[in-house]
């Protein structure tokens, strides 16, 4: 069903297509049928031959079906060109416009002037009738505001500027002087050259610049004033546009100034080529088919027929105007026909025929003419259309050219000046700058005067320069024979480009500063300085071959050996020291606890009557732990228990390892060589990682700065370091020495010099961004090749190596640095001062502690004296009390005795009670319960309670130290004051048994 439906739709689709196409085809047939079938082509020609050829060409055209549609016929209407432009205007109106001409072909004699063709163009253009010129080459006809409908099959004179550019590129001339008249054509050719050169040199390597523009008034009488300016210029290539008459004057005066001979190059336009005094060797241009009116007539007719044919097929053509008196006529078809004409591109008898927006012929061919002896013109090249590449191509046979002075060898095109303006910049060690003293009038023999460039302050210009580049300059000037004036950079910078608005312009343009800016603006001839060769600079200036190859590297300060007061603590980190200190006291505490609580911690020798040894106290444990750690002798206070002794052995092993490690590491820190760098190079992660606390920088606007901008992989790093960049390299190097900047990225030559001069600085990593230092010159400078060859000779002869050793590496200084690095380090007071200070602190601590102990002891003695006085007073008081008690007791006992004696015993005998208690020996301490009252020293005083008298006498009561003890009363003798024997009397007895009287 689907297939059947699809087949059913085919007739309907076919009917739809027929209905849609039929109106279009009908409209086309209607348009073609509405267009005129006959077309009159007017001709304003200069002679009868041209008129006849014009008529014949149109007749032949009617039989050419390629250009003429069916039922279309062309007719010619011609008039003779009149020298009177007014009469020409009337003839155009009466004989051409009245006959409804659709276009007009115009030619005239080259010597008759362009007023008549202009009159035809004005008249026809007023009615929008296209005009095709075949001989008018003035620039005025390119102005479409005046000649609104004018085309031409010949190019204007100022189009020769395009050929000039091709010739300059072929001969590799980079500087030219343009000579032109001040009329419209002269200024047009200058404008064409300047405009075209801006886009032309994008595709070629050699760029030509205009050094001098000489403009003169037509109808010259003398050209000598301009020749004086031209003679002082550097360029010797002259591009001249002048009429034949003016060219004669210019060549005459130039010959008198010897400016048409050897070394000079003249390239002129067609008019000047026909001067009767054109010098030998002049190169000129001549338009191909320039005088072939018949060829141009045929090409113009066929171009017109081609445009009308296309217009007929696309739109309706209204009839041409018929009455010159009708000023209201506005022929739109004529305007449209003019646009069709400009779009034509055909191959005709005069070559490839095409037009630009102004209606001027493009792709016109030229012959390159070389003037020989006796004004003979010899074709040495062609500028023609290349159909394969669809563009114009220059072909010149250099071997056939005879140059001015009858030379076969191409001139250099420039005058090489022998006195140059040189610029330099202060950059150690390449250029040292010294201000002259007030009493100095000249520089040293190895120095050269170098005032500030373009500085009017006389006092600020007194500088002398020396160094690597100055020695190179002195030798270079001798080798290639030039003199110079040396000056310092006006702003102290190498130069970088900035984008700046031009006055009255909407676009930004690059502008160079510093040394490069002076060279680009041609205020200096050469830069002799450590100028890095890079693509940005090479686009605007010339460079010699490098006189020193180098790259980019990193400067940093060497890691210092920390010779501080606590340098002896460096082998261990702070954390490790803290752990060791904690371990000492923890082990001491554990030793004390193990020895305290161990059941086997206290022991005594077998069969020994001595008391058991005491356990290890905390103080002794700390002393033991420190003694083992510091490897000092342990005389007392060692652990007693087995468990504590095991821990002590382990602690001794720990102490041995710690002390050995400390000793070895201390030697490594204080004696062995330190690491040279912190960074491994540009690829170090710390440089790439923007989060690291590491500052790096370069000099802003320098070649290194440009390098980082170009490198995409370094963009993150550049954004970080951009804010830290310095104005000069000197400032950055000083900050590296002070430790304010960790890494300075700069040219390796300068940094190697700084590292060789200061042993504390070192370059890190390998070179990157390799380039070289070159001598800068102006674009197209004649000195470029000579300077390059001289530098290559210097490399071969070893002169550059000599400069490296003398100025950069500082041989003796570098050897001293290497000796310093290789010699083992000797420890001095600076390294070990902390240890001595530690001993001093120990001594001071000991003295301080003994002072504290003395003060404390004095305080204790005073306190003890007060206690002794109080105790003595208490003892005396206690003795008095005891004495009274004893007397009372004695009296009471005597009374009892007297009573008992009278009642029981016989007189003359007494029975004394015996104290059976054990008394301590002399000097033995007793407990408080055994102390005798009044004995301050707690030493037992034993006295005899009774002293027996002689036989027949009654015994005397001496004393009693025991309250309540019965005292014998001997008779009625009254007790007298007791007489106490001295303490520790040898008459002491420890036992009293019986006393018998």
Curated annotation (Swiss-Prot):
Keywords: Calcium, Cell membrane, Disulfide bond, Glycoprotein, Ion channel, Ion transport, Ligand-gated ion channel, Magnesium, Membrane, Phosphoprotein, Postsynaptic cell membrane, Receptor, Signal, Synapse, Transmembrane, Transmembrane helix, Transport. It is a multi-pass membrane protein. Glycine binds at residues 530-532, 537, 703, 747. One of its GO terms (molecular function) is NMDA glutamate receptor activity. Its main location: membrane. Residues 27-573, 673-831 are extracellular. This is Glutamate [NMDA] receptor subunit 1. Residues 595-651, 853-997 are cytoplasmic. Forms a heteromeric NMDA channel with Nmdar2. Residues 1-26 form the signal peptide. Residues 970-997 are annotated as: Disordered. PANTHER family: IONOTROPIC GLUTAMATE RECEPTOR (PTHR18966). It is found in: Cell membrane; Postsynaptic cell membrane; Postsynaptic density. The chain crosses the membrane at residues 574-594, 652-672, 832-852. NMDA receptor subtype of glutamate-gated ion channels with high calcium permeability and voltage-dependent sensitivity to magnesium. Mediated by glycine. This protein plays a key role in synaptic plasticity, synaptogenesis, excitotoxicity, memory acquisition and learning. It mediates neuronal functions in glutamate neurotransmission. Is involved in the cell surface targeting of NMDA receptors. Plays a role in associative learning and in long-term memory consolidation. One of its GO terms (biological process) is olfactory learning.
């Amino acid at each position: 069903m689907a297939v059947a439906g699809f087949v059913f739709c085919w007739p309907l689709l076919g009917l739809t297509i027929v209905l849609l196409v039929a109106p279009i085809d009908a409209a086309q047939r209607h348009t073609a049928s509405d267009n005129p079938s006959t077309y009159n082509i007017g001709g304003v020609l200069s002679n009868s031959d041209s008129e006849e050829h014009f008529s014949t060409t149109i007749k032949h055209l009617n039989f050419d079906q390629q250009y003429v549609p069916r039922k279309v016929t062309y007719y010619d209407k011609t008039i003779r060109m009149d020298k009177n432009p007014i009469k020409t205007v009337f003839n155009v109106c009466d004989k051409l416009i009245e006959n409804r001409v659709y276009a007009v072909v115009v030619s005239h004699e080259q010597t008759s002037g362009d007023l008549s063709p202009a009159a035809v163009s004005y008249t026809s253009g007023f009615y929008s009738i296209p005009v095709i010129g075949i001989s008018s080459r003035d620039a005025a006809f390119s102005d479409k505001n005046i000649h609104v409908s004018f085309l031409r099959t010949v190019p204007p004179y100022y189009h020769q500027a395009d050929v000039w550019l091709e010739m300059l590129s072929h001969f590799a001339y980079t500087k030219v002087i343009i000579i032109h008249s001040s009329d419209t054509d002269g200024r047009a050719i200058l404008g064409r050259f300047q405009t075209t050169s801006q886009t032309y040199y994008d595709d070629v390597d050699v760029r030509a610049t205009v050094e001098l523009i000489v403009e003169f008034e037509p109808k010259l009488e003398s050209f000598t004033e301009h020749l004086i300016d031209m003679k002082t210029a550097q360029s010797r290539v002259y591009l001249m546009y002048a009429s034949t008459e003016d060219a004669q004057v210019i060549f005459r005066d130039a010959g008198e100034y010897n400016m048409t001979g050897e070394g000079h190059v003249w390239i002129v336009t067609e008019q000047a080529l026909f001067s009767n005094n054109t010098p030998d060797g002049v190169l000129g241009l001549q338009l191909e088919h320039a005088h072939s009116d018949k060829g141009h007539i045929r090409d113009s007719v066929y171009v017109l027929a081609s445009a009308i044919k296309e217009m007929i097929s696309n739109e309706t053509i209204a009839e041409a105007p018929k009455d010159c008196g009708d000023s209201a006529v506005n022929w739109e078809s004529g305007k449209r026909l003019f646009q069709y004409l400009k779009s034509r591109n055909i191959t005709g008898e005069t070559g490839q025929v095409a037009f630009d927006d102004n209606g001027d012929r493009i792709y016109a061919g030229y012959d390159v003419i070389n003037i020989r002896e006796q004004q003979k013109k010899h074709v040495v090249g062609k500028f023609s259309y290349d159909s394969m590449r669809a563009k114009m191509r220059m072909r010149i046979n250099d071997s056939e050219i005879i140059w001015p002075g009858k030379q076969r060898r191409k001139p250099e095109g420039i005058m090489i000046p022998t006195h140059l303006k040189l610029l330099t910049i202060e950059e150690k060690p390449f250029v040292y700058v010294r201000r002259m003293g007030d009493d100095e009038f000249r520089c040293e023999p190895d120095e050269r005067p170098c005032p500030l460039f373009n500085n009017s302050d006389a006092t600020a210009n007194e500088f002398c320069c020396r160094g690597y580049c100055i020695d190179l300059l002195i030798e270079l000037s001798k080798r290639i024979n030039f003199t110079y004036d040396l000056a310092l950079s006006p702003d102290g910078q190498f130069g970088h480009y900035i984008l700046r608005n031009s006055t009255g312009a909407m676009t930004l343009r690059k502008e160079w500063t510093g040394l490069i800016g002076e060279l680009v603006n041609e205020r200096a001839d050469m830069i002799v300085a450590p100028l890095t060769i890079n693509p940005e600079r090479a686009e605007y200036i010339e460079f010699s071959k490098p006189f020193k190859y180098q790259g980019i590297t990193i400067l940093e300060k060497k890691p210092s050996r920390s010779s501080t007061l606590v340098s002896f603590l460096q082998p261990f980190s702070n954390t490790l020291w803290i752990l060791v200190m904690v371990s000492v006291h923890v082990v001491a505490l554990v030793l004390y606890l193990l020895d305290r609580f161990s059941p086997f911690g206290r022991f005594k020798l077998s069969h020994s009557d001595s008391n058991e040894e005491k356990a290890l106290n905390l103080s002794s444990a700390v002393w033991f732990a420190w003694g083992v750690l510091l490897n000092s002798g342990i005389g007392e206070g060692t652990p007693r228990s087995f468990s504590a002794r095991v821990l002590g052995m382990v602690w001794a092993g720990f102490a041995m390892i710690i002390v050995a490690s400390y000793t070895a590491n201390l030697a490594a820190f204080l004696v062995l060589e330190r690491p040279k760098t912190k960074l491994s190079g540009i690829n170090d992660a710390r440089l790439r990682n923007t989060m690291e606390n590491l500052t790096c920088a370069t000099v802003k606007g320098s070649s290194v700065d440009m390098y980082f901008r170009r490198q995409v992989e370094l963009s993150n790093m550049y954004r970080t370091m951009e804010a830290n960049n310095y104005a000069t390299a000197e400032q950055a190097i000083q900050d590296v020495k002070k430790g304010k900047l960790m890494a300075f990225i700069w040219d390796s030559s300068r940094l190697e010099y700084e590292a060789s001069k200061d042993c504390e600085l070192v370059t890190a990593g390998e070179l990157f961004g390799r380039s070289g230092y070159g001598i800068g010159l102006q674009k197209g400078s004649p000195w470029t090749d000579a300077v390059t060859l001289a530098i290559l000779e210097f490399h071969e002869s070893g002169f550059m190596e000599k400069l490296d050793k003398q100025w950069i590496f500082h041989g003796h200084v570098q050897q001293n640095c290497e000796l310093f690095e290789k010699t083992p380090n000797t420890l001095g007071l600076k390294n070990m001062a902390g240890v001595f200070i530690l001993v001093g602190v120990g001594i001071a601590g000991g003295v301080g502690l003994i002072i504290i102990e003395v003060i404390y002891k004095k305080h204790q003695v005073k306190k003890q004296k007060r206690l002794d006085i109080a105790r003595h007073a208490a003892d005396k008081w206690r003795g008095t009390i005891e004495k009274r008690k004893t007397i009372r007791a004695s009296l009471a006992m005597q009374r009892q005795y007297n009573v008992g004696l009278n009642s029981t015993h016989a007189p003359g005998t007494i029975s004394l009670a015996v104290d059976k208690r054990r008394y301590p020996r002399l000097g033995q301490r007793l407990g408080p319960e055994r102390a005798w009252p009044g004995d301050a020293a707690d030493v037992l005083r034993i006295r005899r309670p009774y002293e027996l008298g002689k036989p027949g006498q009654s015994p005397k009561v001496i004393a009693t130290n025991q309250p309540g003890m019965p005292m014998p009363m001997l008779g009625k003798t009254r007790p007298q004051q007791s007489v106490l024997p001295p303490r520790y009397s040898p008459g002491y007895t420890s036992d009293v048994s019986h006393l018998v009287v």
